[in-house]
């Protein structure tokens, strides 16, 4: 069975006013279909930066060096593309349809001035051919699936109206979308 995700010798550095910060050094791993990989480590050990790199979400001052980053057998390292626009278009498709990340802090990810329903519906509208009504129903179903009580009512609430655990479940629902 072929790897779904393969990362070979990933290194991530950040340029700062104080010099170079080495966030990730020579990390390699593979994930096969139906397999779950947990990345654990101390705070600041590079777990998030590793995954931001794989998903093409690294900050502008970050630099990735990798022998290979493959998703479903295709190179997804930016150097494999003709230009940044082509890379971004490919990654946007992969992120929306094939790969998702559950962020550690939901309040960093959720927009405080947008209703939860709006934030759940947006990725569905961007990455599916469903109508707005179908997207709304799917969002309600996803909320129900992750254990959010009264999802129809919750669609019209803001992130601050949710407990920390419920906000985390909304992020999981978005990843499932």
Region annotations inferred by a language model:
Residues 1-177:
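ABC transporter nucleotide-binding domains
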């Amino acid at each position: 069975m072929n790897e779904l995700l393969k990362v070979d010798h990933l290194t991530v550095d950040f340029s700062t006013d104080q010099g170079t910060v080495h966030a990730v050094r020579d990390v390699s791993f593979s994930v096969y279909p139906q397999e779950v990989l947990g990345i654990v480590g101390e705070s600041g050990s590079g777990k998030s930066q590793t995954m931001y790199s794989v998903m093409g979400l690294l900050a502008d001052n970050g630099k990735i060096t990798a022998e290979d980053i493959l998703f479903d057998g295709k190179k997804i390292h930016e150097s494999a593309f003709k230009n940044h626009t082509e890379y971004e278009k490919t990654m946007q498709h992969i992120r929306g349809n094939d790969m998702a990340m559950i962020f550690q802090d939901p309040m960093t990810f959720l927009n405080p001035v947008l209703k939860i329903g709006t934030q759940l519906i947006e990725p569905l509208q961007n990455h599916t051919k469903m109508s707005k009504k179908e997207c709304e129903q799917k969002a309600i179903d996803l909320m129900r699936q992750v254990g959010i009580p009264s999802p129809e009512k919750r669609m019209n609430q803001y992130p601050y109206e949710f407990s920390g655990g419920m906000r985390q479940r909304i992020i999981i629902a978005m990843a499932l979308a």
